[in-house]
Amino acid sequence: MKKICWILCFCCFMTFWNAKTSVSYAKEGQVFTYTVNQQALLKFLNSSSNEYNNTMKQGITLAEFASKKGIDEAKLIHYFAIEQKTQLDIALNKGEIDPQMYQDLLPDIHHSIYRTIHYNPNSK
């Protein structure tokens, strides 16, 4: 019984911790959303809009699609990191986010890009 109680307490603690940490760096009203420049991405991938959309509908991830186009994962991550950093810089300069939020978001860029390029909601 004690083990179950400790496990439940630990699970509750972890749930609370994870729910709290994802927004703890953001002050009220601060939101940063990365917006993909679709035309620039298609140019980088050397792809047409139809080819890209059809591939995504088939459940292929962006990393797999880029690989078929001869672009390795590191280049793809670097491309998105530069794009996101540029948008973060603009948001900081416009006052949409503060320096603390900017500094808190930077370390997670590569990890979030990695998750994104390896995810496709249409995959089986």
Predicted regions and their residues:
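Mature extracytoplasmic/periplasmic regions of secreted or cell-envelope proteins
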Residues: 3-14, 18-124
